Design a protein with these regions (language model features):
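Generic secondary-structure boundary/loop-capping signal
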Residues: 3, 114-116, 338, 371
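Noncatalytic, helix-rich "gating/capping" subdomain that lines the substrate-entry/channel surface
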Residues: 26-322
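Short capping/connector residues at structural and topological boundaries
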Residues: 11, 106-108, 122-124, 129, ...
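N-terminal mature-domain "stem" immediately C-terminal to a signal peptide or N-terminal signal-anchor/transmembrane
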Residues: 1-32, 185
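Intrinsically disordered, low-complexity linker/terminal regions across diverse proteins
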Residues: 173, 202-205, 224-228, 285, ...
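Short amphipathic alpha-helical segments with coiled-coil-like heptad repeat character
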Residues: 2-9, 149-159, 355-357
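Secondary-structure junction/capping motif
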Residues: 13-18, 42-43, 195, 207, ...
Length: 393
């Protein structure tokens, strides 16, 4: 450790971090080259270059301040009923926030041939319920409250400390009903299919028609509820908590999502808590790394296609594919030669081997980003919201 001191921007540093660092340098060089030429409007090169440039433009970000979130924040603080709340929750979910609960589509755990709609416990600003409930985390809760107070102050809210305390109290009530990490490991206990009718009747504090419409989720028959009793508690909180508390909670969640892409003052406050206090980082990542990570995340396959064209040509991929095929052939021959395995079992083993799918380096068909619009005339945050919504849909 003395010979290899931890870099201040890292909370940990290992072999995979070295590989990631090397790739970040390569990707940054590719992005820098893109900014030096004029790409065709609508091309992935234009989208990558514009996102990267906006992320680097600290002067513009600082000039805009928190103006990019003003319209959304005003809508959040104007929420007056269940329908408006449900619409705002959907909007924040589309922008990568996570208030009240988490919704997503993934393979059905009991039938991998199907995709299923899932709803899970989510919505805690600090993520883990233990941060709210364990006495040993009292100091962390104070720092979290300080972050919220700072964020609300920078936005210009009245009584920011009081509002921050209300958010922490609300999230603590949620955390009390969250399942522990150990309980979440029980797959069967966290797989609870419900019909759409039963689901919307049981959790009636949310206007699900408005929510699903806002999320772009069409009609469905069944939804998998991860933690029914947790959602019961959230449902009750939405019914009984003052509307002002719900608004402020949504505002806190929204600002935490937006802060890394706004002016330096709010990002510094965000980093102080989420980077330094929560993760142990001593310094912010350099701006170029933060700017580079955005198009790399949102346009990952487009970046990958450009990357492999330079660093992993088709000829290298085919060599690796052939190597894997050789291994498959060798394994097949090995199965046939086993004297302790019955013919029926060998046939099953060969059948299983034949289903092996080879994926090397990059896909045969790349994701199409043509319908995603990146407009440099809009703010950085507005573009990220649009991109996140596009990706979620």
């Amino acid at each position: 450790q003395k010979k290899n001191p931890l870099k201040p921007e890292f909370a940990r540093y290992g072999a995979f971090d070295v590989l990631r660092e090397n790739n970040e340098v390569r990707i940054n060089e590719l992005f820098s080259q893109m900014t030096k030429s004029t790409a065709e409007k609508g091309s992935v090169e234009q989208k990558i270059a514009d996102l990267y440039t906006m992320g680097l433009d600290s002067a513009r970000l600082n000039s805009e301040g928190l103006a990019p979130v003003k319209e959304d924040m005003e809508a959040i603080m104007a929420v007056a009923d269940a329908k408006q709340l449900s619409q705002i929750v959907a909007q924040i979910h589309m922008q990568a926030g996570n208030p009240l609960f988490g919704v997503g589509v993934s393979a059905d755990l009991m039938n991998s041939n199907l995709n299923a709609l899932y709803i899970q416990q989510s919505g805690l600003g600090m993520g883990n319920r233990d941060y709210y409930l364990d006495e040993e985390n009292a100091a962390l809760r104070e720092r979290y409250t300080a972050w919220l107070t700072k964020a609300f102050t920078l936005y210009g809210m009245e009584n920011p400390a009081e509002k921050a305390a209300a958010v922490v109290a609300f999230e603590t009530k949620m955390a009390e009903k969250f399942r522990s990490n150990v309980e979440l490991r029980d797959i069967a206990a966290n797989y609870n299919p419900m019909s759409k009718a039963d689901f919307t009747k049981r959790y009636d504090a949310i206007d699900w028609t408005a929510y699903f419409e806002g999320m772009g989720i069409g009609d469905f028959d069944t939804i998998i509820v991860g933690q029914p009793e947790t959602l019961d508690a959230v449902n009750q909180l939405v019914k009984t908590e003052p509307i002002e508390t719900l608004r402020t909670y949504l505002a806190a969640n929204y600002l935490a999502s937006a802060a890394p892409y706004l002016s330096d003052d709010i990002y510094a406050a965000y980093f102080e808590f989420f980077g330094r206090q929560m993760s142990g980082q001593q310094e912010m990542r350099p701006r170029w790394k933060r700017a580079m990570s955005v198009p790399n995340g949102l346009l990952g396959e487009a970046v990958g296609e450009i990357y492999v064209s330079k660093y992993f040509p088709e000829s290298d991929k085919q060599r690796m594919v052939q190597m894997v095929k050789n291994l498959q052939t060798a394994l097949s021959q090995h199965i046939d030669a086993l004297d302790w395995m019955s013919d029926a079992t060998k046939a099953k083993a060969q059948e299983k081997l034949a289903t092996f799918t080879v994926k090397i380096g990059y896909p045969d068909k790349w994701k199409d980003y043509s319908s995603l619009e990146i407009d440099p005339a809009l703010t950085y945050w507005e573009n990220l919201k649009r991109a996140s919504a596009w990706y979620t849909r």
